[in-house]
């Protein structure tokens, strides 16, 4: 159904448009997207005729600053936080609304000899400011357009137009598939663009690596910074890491209450210690400690979830009651750290099939799942049962 990002980039380089679909839980919409430098009158006319939405021009913050594109409103209350600027027309246009004149405005925006005084405000082209970091910071069509233009080798600016049906309703996936077929356009998802960038770019920086003697044995500890959000992650490394055989790996998400305070509500602490013991016994391996407290919802929200569990909800229901998915963790940054450490093939210490899928999706080979069984007891029995029944964890529970 969907095309690859590589196929879409090739079409964009040839001046074609593609259809980009966002997440079902977000806007659940498709937009026509092209590189801004491909915004011919024919392209604009195609978008307004067959898309029927608003023609917008996503640009970088630097681009918006150069043209003095101020925010459209002082207080942005849009549900998705779309960063509209004041609308513009190129100064020599007439009304600015025709396909020819909208094309003229878009192309003028790319001319570095033009400045703010060369445009009238308001107008008929609606610039949008993409977040620095692109779809890795905000999974919107704005960021997707700028990312795609950059990845295609062009100026990081695009043209987008929402796609509506003839009756004025929003086109959903079945209609978008038909539109892509009718006009021979590539159809891609923002989720696939995120995965592509995580596979092909590096967003992590190793800051330091030192020796770390522990109660389990002698390790090296390497600290990494996620350059997108500033979060710090660490890897405990045992032995030499190379491609000659699969490496024993544990990807462990931070759990202050379990790892540090020995909470009985979860099995995180016992899993952490068991993993270190197994890596030490194996003589070689990596424990990657990721700052993803509470399966990604953070410490305060995890404690709020505990409160809801005291009122009778299970761990999944509590997350959903707070407005979160059952598991918000993303394994892309972890995969980049493992790649930086030289890991290509691994034996993964986990009971979580989603973790296996998450890491293999970023180009790492999981050649074996090594179970990580820890004791169950009165306090964590329901928690473990919920992980097994609702999250698909591969556990062997008593009764």
From Swiss-Prot:
GO terms for biological process: riboflavin biosynthetic process. Catalyzes the conversion of D-ribulose 5-phosphate to formate and 3,4-dihydroxy-2-butanone 4-phosphate. Catalyzes the conversion of GTP to 2,5-diamino-6-ribosylamino-4(3H)-pyrimidinone 5'-phosphate (DARP), formate and pyrophosphate. The record marks 124, 162 as: Essential for DHBP synthase activity. PANTHER family: 3,4-DIHYDROXY-2-BUTANONE 4-PHOSPHATE SYNTHASE, GTP CYCLOHYDROLASE II-RELATED. In the N-terminal section; belongs to the DHBP synthase family. In the C-terminal section; belongs to the GTP cyclohydrolase II family. One of its GO terms (molecular function) is manganese ion binding. It catalyses: D-ribulose 5-phosphate = (2S)-2-hydroxy-3-oxobutyl phosphate + formate + H(+); GTP + 4 H2O = 2,5-diamino-6-hydroxy-4-(5-phosphoribosylamino)-pyrimidine + formate + 2 phosphate + 3 H(+). The lineage of its organism: Bacteria, Bacillati, Bacillota, Bacilli, Bacillales. Pathway: Cofactor biosynthesis; riboflavin biosynthesis; 2-hydroxy-3-oxobutyl phosphate from D-ribulose 5-phosphate: step 1/1; Cofactor biosynthesis; riboflavin biosynthesis; 5-amino-6-(D-ribitylamino)uracil from GTP: step 1/4. Binds 2 divalent metal cations per subunit. Magnesium or manganese. The gene is ribBA. CDD domains: GTP_cyclohydro2 (cd00641). The keyword NAD does not apply. Mg(2+) 2 binds at residues 27, 141. Residues 200-399 are annotated as: GTP cyclohydrolase II. HAMAP family: RibA (MF_00179), RibB (MF_00180), RibBA (MF_01283). This is Riboflavin biosynthesis protein RibBA. Zn(2+) binds at residues 255, 266, 268. It holds the Pfam family GTP_cyclohydro2. It comes from Brevibacillus brevis (strain 47 / JCM 6285 / NBRC 100599). GO terms for cellular component: cytosol. The keyword Oxidoreductase does not apply.
